[in-house]
Swiss-Prot record:
Minor apolipoprotein that associates with LDL. Inhibits cholesteryl ester transfer protein (CETP) activity and appears to be an important regulator of cholesterol transport. Also associates to a lesser degree with VLDL, Apo-AI and Apo-AII. This is Apolipoprotein F. InterPro entries: APOF. Keywords: Cholesterol metabolism, Cleavage on pair of basic residues, HDL, LDL, Lipid metabolism, Lipid transport, Secreted, Signal, Steroid metabolism, Sterol metabolism, Transport. Belongs to the apolipoprotein F family. The gene is Apof. GO terms for cellular component: extracellular space; high-density lipoprotein particle; low-density lipoprotein particle. The keyword Signal applies.
Length: 308
């Protein structure tokens, strides 16, 4: 059972009733009872329980430089944070972000990935012993290829590896079951793309990076069993081609920096005869979808008050 995250200001006389993390705010747990795939009509009928900053702080766009990242990077970070938002009870944000993910990955594949990631989080993942250094290099190389040097340079120089506001969010959500796991996964990938390897390692501890790698392997049908095959068939070609390149780059980098990771027994060996999309087609689809991420995620939504 998930929980809704509400941040509130309380007096000293009642502060002991909640789990407080600062002198001016606390975290209140409220049971969550809404299914994963809610249509807009049902989401609209839910009471406006999401607190503006506690929920907005979990949105991908709250991460500096996110809007300049290429589509695959946005999809991976967004997928993890979408599940964090659901566990936190931020229903309007969940649906709005999910619509953005649909545009990149397709409806069927995205829904299957959401469910698969939830299953992985509950304990259905193996230890891949992923090299964060190699994954960071692979993510940066793919970003350079997809978005072009100038855009990547602007993204990588947008911030340093330490961000006080993001760290404050992390300090709270890491204490919340499931929310913290998904948030750590999303920000581990984010910092890896930003070439903040130490920060990515910090967020990727306790299996978060392994979870992300398992997700990548599922997207190309090399993990997840029948689910992986369904996802691979349904995933949009441009995104799938990006994942295939990313995995290839990872193994190239991993072979240079570390010994080969342990391979799951049920995972086939990666071959170069996977489906390829030409670079021109990839860039064309990327350009046609990139603008969607710049739009506001929420419209006509009533938020509760929040104080840090």
């Amino acid at each position: 059972m998930g929980a809704q995250l509400l941040t509130c200001t309380v007096s000293d006389s009642i502060r002991h009733q909640f789990s407080c993390f600062a002198t001016s705010c606390c975290v209140l747990w409220v049971p969550k009872g809404v299914s994963t795939m809610l249509p807009p009509s049902q989401l609209g009928s839910q009471p406006p329980t999401s607190d503006p900053l506690s929920c907005q702080a979990l949105l991908p766009r709250s991460l500096p430089g996110f809007t300049h990242m290429p589509p695959l990077s946005k999809f991976l970070v967004g997928l993890a944070l979408r599940n964090a938002l659901e566990e936190a009870g931020c229903w309007a944000d969940v649906w709005a972000l999910q619509l953005q993910l649909y545009r990149f990955g397709g409806v069927e594949a995205t829904q299957a990935l959401i469910r698969h990631l939830q299953e992985l989080q509950k304990g259905g993942r193996a230890d891949w012993k992923v090299s964060v250094n190699a994954l960071s290099s692979a993510l940066q190389l793919l970003a350079w290829e997809q978005a072009g040097p100038k855009r990547v340079k602007r993204s990588l120089s947008n911030m340093g590896c330490e961000n006080e506001q993001e760290q404050r969010v992390h300090n709270v959500v890491e204490l919340l079951p499931a929310v913290g796991t998904y948030y750590n996964l999303g920000t581990a990938l984010y910092y890896a793309i930003k070439n903040c390897t130490d920060k990515a390692k910090e967020r990727g501890r306790d299996g978060a990076i392994d979870l992300g790698y398992d997700l990548l392997m599922t997207m190309v049908g090399m993990s997840g069993g029948p689910t992986g095959a369904v996802i691979t068939a349904a995933l949009k070609p441009a995104l799938k081609a990006g994942v295939q390149r990313l995995i290839r780059y990872y193994h190239d980098e991993e072979g240079v920096t570390t010994s080969q990771p342990e391979t799951r027994k049920d995972a086939p060996t990666y071959r170069d005869d996977v489906e390829e999309t030409t670079m021109s087609n990839l860039v064309s689809e990327v350009e046609s979808t990139t603008s969607n991420w710049g739009r506001p995620l929420l419209k006509n939504y009533v938020f509760l008050a929040y104080k840090r």
